């Protein structure tokens, strides 16, 4: 008499647990980054033995704001903060294009994902590194085109 309700509750509990577990497996998430800025250095291509090569460069993004109260907001001092991002390009076609055409000072748009990785430095100390794994790069300017022509 008491067994049957306990068995029903147990079955219902197991079913709910399995539904929760399966929904976690099927749950979608998003790791997406979009950056618009200027390249800080010409790219380098690195290859660790047994791994695919990677093109690496830095990208600066700027955040600007005015200080002051609401009335003086238009007249306030402009402050700026620059954030540097490490961009890594692994996709073969994009990696080669980035290595060849990304140049210091160029204005580019990068789409990708954030990756928090670890590596061993030259002193054999474990370090953490945050990088943007690029899967799309749009070239918005060419440094050579922006320089004024003399003469």
Curated annotation (Swiss-Prot):
Keywords: Acetylation, DNA replication, DNA-binding, Mitochondrion, Mitochondrion nucleoid, Phosphoprotein, Transit peptide. GO terms for molecular function: chromatin binding; enzyme activator activity; identical protein binding; protein homodimerization activity; single-stranded DNA binding. SUPFAM superfamilies: Nucleic acid-binding proteins. The modification N6-acetyllysine is found at residue 113. It comes from the Eukaryota. Gene3D superfamilies: Nucleic acid-binding proteins. The modification N6-succinyllysine is found at residue 122. The modification Phosphoserine is found at residues 67, 79. It is found in: Mitochondrion; Mitochondrion matrix, Mitochondrion nucleoid. One of its GO terms (biological process) is mitochondrion organization. Homotetramer. Interacts with MPG/AAG, through inhibition of its glycosylase activity it potentially prevents formation of DNA breaks in ssDNA, ensuring that base removal primarily occurs in dsDNA. Interacts with POLDIP2. Interacts with PRIMPOL. Binds preferentially and cooperatively to pyrimidine rich single-stranded DNA (ss-DNA). In vitro, required to maintain the copy number of mitochondrial DNA (mtDNA) and plays a crucial role during mtDNA replication by stimulating the activity of the replisome components POLG and TWNK at the replication fork. Promotes the activity of the gamma complex polymerase POLG, largely by organizing the template DNA and eliminating secondary structures to favor ss-DNA conformations that facilitate POLG activity. In addition it is able to promote the 5'-3' unwinding activity of the mtDNA helicase TWNK. This is Single-stranded DNA-binding protein, mitochondrial. It comes from Rattus norvegicus (Rat).
